[in-house]
């Protein structure tokens, strides 16, 4: 018998992880990292929208030129509320997004829920 995948003990029902992968144009990684460090992340922190962030990552092997973010939300309503606040943050949108967008080739967003085994980030 296979166990159903669902919330773990102590987890809110339907906790979601959002994996956001941004593929950059070749040669633009250093510029993108600088924008995130100088403008993007400080704007999120100032607006209080950094609390759901698990981490930022850069690809190294396989598909390269990617920046990856992992976010953790209590449920879909929490996720939607978070992104509404992010995109209402003028420092983030006008100071960062408008400068970062031309560096991007593609954006991929995956919603994930935790399996009932393994580490619990």
Task: Annotate each PLM feature.
Residues 1-121:
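Short S/T/G/P-rich N-terminal loop/turn motif that feeds into the first structured element of a domain
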């Amino acid at each position: 018998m296979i166990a159903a995948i669902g919330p773990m003990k102590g987890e809110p029902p339907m906790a979601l992880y959002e994996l956001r992968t941004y593929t950059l144009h070749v040669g633009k990684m250093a510029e993108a990292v600088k924008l995130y460090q100088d403008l993007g992340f400080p704007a999120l922190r100032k607006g209080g929208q950094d609390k759901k962030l698990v981490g930022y990552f850069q690809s190294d092997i396989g598909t390269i030129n990617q920046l990856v973010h992992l976010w953790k939300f209590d449920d879909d309503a929490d996720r939607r509320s978070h992104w509404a606040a992010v995109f209402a943050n003028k420092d983030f949108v006008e100071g960062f997004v408008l400068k970062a967008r031309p560096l991007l080739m593609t954006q991929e967003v995956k919603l994930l829920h935790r399996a009932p085994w393994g580490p619990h980030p």
